[in-house]
Amino acid sequence: MAISKEKKNEIIAQYARHEGDTGSVEVQVAVLTWEINHLNDHIKQHKKDHATYRGLMKKIGHRRNLLAYLRRKDVNRYRELISSLGLRR
């Protein structure tokens, strides 16, 4: 199931850097994280759904690339983001 418009707007409002910000790295990573968590729950119930698993891996790779970019450009923003999303230990 895709992310609802209301949920996506809620995530955007929480992680946006300024009004109308929908494309910053923080927003993209936050939306991807929600989608990844949702797909993880689906995969736990439907272990043989290989197409969804492939989509999950693609989203994880995209998030990894965005986080690597953010870490190169601004370490402080990277650290704030991963702590707020609870991605690393």
Curated annotation (Swiss-Prot):
What the entry lists under InterPro entries is as follows: Ribosomal_uS15, Ribosomal_uS15_bac-type, uS15_NS1_RNA-bd_sf
Any one Gene Ontology cellular component term annotated for this protein: cytosolic small ribosomal subunit
Q: Name one GO molecular function term.
A: rRNA binding
Instruction: Look up the domain of life of the source.
Output: Bacteria
Could you state one GO biological process linked to this protein?
A: translation
Instruction: Print the keywords alphabetically.
Output: Ribonucleoprotein, Ribosomal protein, RNA-binding, rRNA-binding
State the SUPFAM superfamilies in the record: S15/NS1 RNA-binding domain
Against SMART domains, the record matches this protein to: Ribosomal_S15 (SM01387)
**Family per record:** Belongs to the universal ribosomal protein uS15 family.
Subunit comment:
Part of the 30S ribosomal subunit. Forms a bridge to the 50S subunit in the 70S ribosome, contacting the 23S rRNA.
Which PANTHER family does this UniProt record tie to the protein? RIBOSOMAL PROTEIN S15, BACTERIAL AND ORGANELLAR (PTHR23321), SMALL RIBOSOMAL SUBUNIT PROTEIN US15M (PTHR23321:SF26)
The record's function comment reads: One of the primary rRNA binding proteins, it binds directly to 16S rRNA where it helps nucleate assembly of the platform of the 30S subunit by binding and bridging several RNA helices of the 16S rRNA.
Per its record, how is this protein called by name?
Small ribosomal subunit protein uS15
Q: Which organism is it from?
A: Streptococcus thermophilus (strain ATCC BAA-250 / LMG 18311)
Name of the gene encoding the protein in the UniProt record? rpsO
